[in-house]
A protein has these predicted regions:
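Binuclear metal-dependent phosphoesterase catalytic core
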Residues: 2-9, 13-35, 39, 166, ...
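Solvent-exposed loop/turn segments at secondary-structure junctions
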Residues: 60-63, 101-104, 138-142, 183-187, ...
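N-terminal active-site segment of His-dependent metallophosphoesterases
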Residues: 1-114, 119
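Active-site neighborhood of phospho(di)ester-bond hydrolases with catalytic His/Asp-centered motifs
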Residues: 56-58, 94-100, 131-138, 180, ...
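Loop/turn elements at helix/coil->beta-strand transitions in domains of secreted/extracellular proteins
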Residues: 19-23, 50-53, 91-94, 127-132, ...
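Active-site-proximal beta-strand elements of phosphoester/diester hydrolases
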Residues: 51-66, 174-188, 244-249, 313, ...
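Extended active-site neighborhood of metal-dependent phosphoesterases/phosphodiesterases
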Residues: 27-44, 106-241, 259, 265, ...
Length: 402
């Protein structure tokens, strides 16, 4: 009876590998409780069909035409599976990409950028049928010394909803989002920074017009248009958290030790923004980017944004690690981890649920399979497959023994 099963052993091994590939691409997600969530009863976390569920990824670090064999047929293959399986299981309403789509975008010609865009669209798969928004990172457009209005405008024109300065503002399901080109906010006086300031002004005026009488905003508009390019602002009496959802690539400045804490799917403390960034850069697989992982927006820019926009919640990226931080004014900032094996062995993403019946936002941290685990699994399957082939064909085994 055992002999009759021997020829089927290799087939069983192959089927086991197929099942493993499907299972390993399933994300493991866990809700991360913010300070506002701790006071909410458990019933508040029940999903409502009218809630807005947004999947947020960052730091894809695509290589386009410069991708090698391993990149194309292993890492990209699994990243595509991660996107597809996440779409099937989580059923999000929208996708946000918080910068660094390209590993070397600021160094690429337009022809090579096109190959990155093709690779990006290939990865998205089913997400192309959903609303999606992309912001620009330092790897996409470069650092201050190399910022060019024409090149930034060209890159921004390839993504929906971005203006010439790389900023955007949109509303979906009555939730307002504002994305800023945070790279230009690191620089001195330049046209790109002026463009970002104009977006901040406009959104600040609209925020105040919603909260004040129709006659008062007209007077304030003329005052706010007199911009102080050293990031001065007019006093904003609107309470914190009343503004839009803010999307950035660089995190905002953090006071004190800047620590962030949460709990991942394994129950361990997550302090990945500052502490883990002190480890080796993590970008060795794709080179070092223009700015270090510890880089944040300056304190004056951070205060300017808080005063002008009063963001409901802030989502940022760049650090390659997950972080949930509460600023002194009560604003919550969530840093989205890198969703690629190019930046390290611990990829992931964030799912934010904007509830119809309350202001707080539910945030889930989703971890993905480690590259090292997948490689070990492939080696194990290869060894088992060879053994089953030898067992299934005793004559071949006898020949090898001679």
């Amino acid at each position: 009876m055992a002999v009759a099963w021997r020829p089927a052993l290799p087939l069983i091994t192959i089927l086991a590998l197929i099942v493993y590939e499907e299972r390993v691409s399933i994300p493991s997600c866990k809700i991360v409780l913010g300070a506002a969530d701790l006071s909410q009863p458990a019933t508040e976390f029940v999903e409502d069909p009218e809630d807005l569920k947004v999947m947020m990824v960052a730091n894809l670090l695509l290589l386009g035409s410069e991708a090698g064999f391993v990149e194309l047929y292993f890492r990209d293959y699994y990243m595509t599976k991660f996107f597809r399986k996440s779409f099937e299981i989580l059923n999000p309403d929208m996708l946000l990409v918080l910068g660094d789509i390209s590993a070397k975008g600021s160094e690429l010609t337009r022809a090579k950028w096109v190959s990155v865009l093709h690779q990006f669209h290939g990865l998205l798969g089913p997400f192309l049928g959903l609303p999606y928004h992309v912001i620009l990172g330092d790897r996409d457009i470069g650092q201050c010394s190399s910022l060019n209005v024409k090149s930034v405008n060209w890159v921004a024109s390839n993504f929906p909803g971005l203006d010439w300065a790389g900023c955007g503002a949109f509303e979906i399901s009555n939730i307002s989002f504002v994305s800023l080109n945070s790279v230009s906010l690191l620089c001195g006086i330049n046209n790109l920074r002026f463009g970002v300031e104009r977006v901040v002004e406009r959104e600040s005026v609209e925020l105040q017009m919603e909260a004040e009488d129709a006659t008062e905003p007209v007077n304030e508009y003329s005052e706010i248009r007199e911009i102080n390019h050293n990031f001065g602002w007019k006093a904003n009496t609107i309470s914190s958290g009343s503004g839009p959802v803010l999307l950035l690539h660089f995190p905002l400045h953090r006071t004190a030790d800047g620590s962030c804490s949460a709990v991942d799917s394994f129950g361990k403390s997550l302090k990945l923004s500052r502490e883990s960034s002190n480890a080796p850069d993590g970008r060795g697989l794709v080179g070092i980017g223009p700015y270090k992982l510890l880089h944040t927006l300056p304190p004056n820019v951070t205060e300017y944004i808080f005063q002008a926009l009063k963001p409901r919640i802030v989502f940022s990226a760049h650090t390659h690690g997950f972080c949930d931080h509460l600023h002194p004014d009560g604003t919550r900032e969530v840093t989205v981890p890198a969703m690629t094996w190019n930046s390290g062995d611990d990829p992931g993403f964030v799912v934010a649920t904007f509830h119809r019946n309350r202001k707080a936002v539910s945030v889930s941290y989703c971890s993905l399979a480690r590259e090292s685990h997948v490689i070990v699994a492939y080696i194990s399957f290869t060894v088992v497959f060879v053994l089953t082939m030898l067992i299934a064909k005793p004559p071949l085994l006898r020949c090898l023994r001679r």
